[in-house]
């Protein structure tokens, strides 16, 4: 958590968020009024936050990582913009630390060159479009970071992406896997493109597939920037 995010939470009189995320910061929000909702209730959650802000409350909407990266920042702005101008609350987007940044630091330095971030969740994005994006990024030799790589319902998506990338990259291309990045229970393993789907991967896992230049040395992934050594 960034210092600015911590300050925003401490200054708020209402804290809104996914129940799991509120539990992660329970020490910071003790004594504050909270609005917690379950997964798949994002619109309702953010609408309640906007309504509370219109009433004059100092509201914080909690996201994991960075609210502007697969978080609630965009939805809050969209809903706030529907409020008449004379009542519209101001919205500040507080930067956070995205899981891709934390996972990269755990693995070494895999993001030193161009990279893409792709979510494999097809709840709001067609799976064919996700595969197309993965294909284009693989063709462009970009390091590919995968959010939401596997769930109880999505058991084959990661294998399909692996097959797409294998069309363009060596099977021994390094792949880093980090579970619970930056949280208690963090676990890291470095595998390769041929075998990484055999590792334990879930919704709390971030996968980083190296590019054609990525290598592993002394247990760390490195994607060279191109400096002459």
How should these model regions be labeled?
Residues 1-91, 197:
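Class I S-adenosyl-L-methionine
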Residues 3, 71-140:
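Class I SAM-dependent methyltransferase SAM-binding "motif I" and its flanking Rossmann-like core
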Residues 28, 72-73, 103-105, 128-130, ...:
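Short, well-ordered secondary-structure micro-motifs
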């Amino acid at each position: 958590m960034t210092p600015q995010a911590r300050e925003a939470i401490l200054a708020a009189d209402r804290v809104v968020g996914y129940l799991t995320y509120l539990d992660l910061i329970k020490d910071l929000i003790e004594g504050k009024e909270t609005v917690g909702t379950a997964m798949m209730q994002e619109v309702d959650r953010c609408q309640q936050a906007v309504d509370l802000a219109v009433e004059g409350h100092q509201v914080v909407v909690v996201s994991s990582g960075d609210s502007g990266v697969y978080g609630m920042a965009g939805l809050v702005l969209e809903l706030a913009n529907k409020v008449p101008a004379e009542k519209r609350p101001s919205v500040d987007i507080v930067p956070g630390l995205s899981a891709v940044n934390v996972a990269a630091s755990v693995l070494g330095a895999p993001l030193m060159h161009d990279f893409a971030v792709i979510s494999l969740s097809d709840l709001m994005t067609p799976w064919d479009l996700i595969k197309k994006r993965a294909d284009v990024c693989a063709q462009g030799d970009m390091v590919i970071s995968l959010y939401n790589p596997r769930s109880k319902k999505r058991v084959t998506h990661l294998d399909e992406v692996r097959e797409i990338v294998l069309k363009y990259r060596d099977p021994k291309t390094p792949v880093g896997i980090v579970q619970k990045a930056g949280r208690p229970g963090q676990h890291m393993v470095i595998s390769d493109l041929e075998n990484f789907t055999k590792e334990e991967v879930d919704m709390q896992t971030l996968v980083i597939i190296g590019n054609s230049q990525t290598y592993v040395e002394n247990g760390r992934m490195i994607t060279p920037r191109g400096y002459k050594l």
